A protein has these predicted regions:
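A short, charged helix-loop
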Residues: 112-142
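Hydrophobic C-terminal alpha-helix "anchor/cap" residues
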Residues: 18-20, 28, 174
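Acidic, glycine- and histidine-enriched catalytic cores of nucleic acid- and nucleotide-handling enzymes
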Residues: 87-124
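Short aromatic-enriched loop/helix-cap "lid" or pocket-rim segments at secondary-structure transitions
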Residues: 40-43, 108-109, 196
């Protein structure tokens, strides 16, 4: 076991040991790589869900009552959902959510591991981890349409001088739509590595050539990135039925003054 994995496990063991002794804690769930320890490396954070009795949520939300080694914290902050994030002086990251068992039913989950369960936690986690996540429910025809839309949308923002907004549209929205279309169309090299909730996670292992192409494209200026992404979509998905619609690609190119695809 690597030093990173040992340190990761020891920190989690300490937190769980502390939390499981508290009468208002119903359960503790490890999420993401905190659950799937095979993925742990030096960059892995800790992501935990703390399930509590009704009325105890605020006692755990800011982390002040349970985060270990508080003297080493650089910051801890509460987010809109009542959980929070913290960072230690060595760069160790922690994020957490807090809910009652009933409140947990409104969550979404992918990889998880129930560590403490004093009633109902495992059942609810099984339910929410199998629930469809509409934002990642791939539909190739829809997703390619969104991809083409975002190319024009993003380049338009760029030509207005809104470079930050444009960059987000092209590098996040357009790329996300393209990857969703790919997932609906092209078998992954290793489907098990893909994340159900975040379509950008571990694409490099599932579609290595495509991921490398997209990374190179996104390193360019916004408009060059957008134009490269259109070429990448056509190269990987094809132009015409079942791929990038020819009339849609032509309309994008004509509107933006690019060479015909």
């Amino acid at each position: 076991m690597t030093e990173a994995k040992i340190a990761h496990r020891e920190w989690l063991d300490g937190v769980v040991s502390s939390l499981c002794e508290r009468p208002d804690v119903v359960g503790v769930v490890a999420m993401g790589s905190t659950a799937d320890t095979r993925r742990v490396d030096e960059w892995s954070d800790h992501d935990v869900a703390i399930i509590v009795n009704e009325g105890a949520e605020t006692h755990y939300g800011d982390g002040s009552t349970w985060l270990p080694h508080p003297e080493s914290l650089v910051f801890r902050t509460v987010e809109h959902h009542g959980g929070g994030k913290a960072m230690y002086a060595d760069g160790h990251l922690v994020e957490w959510g807090v809910a009652t068992v009933e409140g947990l039913r409104g969550w979404l989950a992918d990889d998880y591991r129930v560590i403490v369960d004093h009633g109902g936690v495992a059942e609810v986690m099984a339910e929410i981890s199998s629930r469809p996540f509409p934002a990642n429910d791939a539909d190739a025809e829809r997703d390619i349409a969104v991809f083409l839309f975002e190319l024009v949308h993003g380049v338009g923002r760029s030509r207005r001088g809104e470079s930050l907004s444009a960059g987000n549209i092209i590098r996040a929205e357009a790329v996300g739509a393209l990857l969703s279309a790919v997932r609906a169309t092209i078998p992954a090299r290793d489907p098990g590595v893909l994340d159900r909730l975040d379509g950008l996670r571990r694409v490099e292992r599932a579609y290595p050539d495509l991921a490398a192409d997209i990374a190179r494209a996104c390193a360019q200026d916004v408009e060059d990135a957008a134009q490269s992404l259109l070429r990448i979509a056509i190269r990987h998905l094809g132009l015409g039925p079942g791929g990038v619609p020819a009339d849609g690609a032509a309309a994008v190119a004509a509107r933006l003054g690019w060479p015909p695809p």
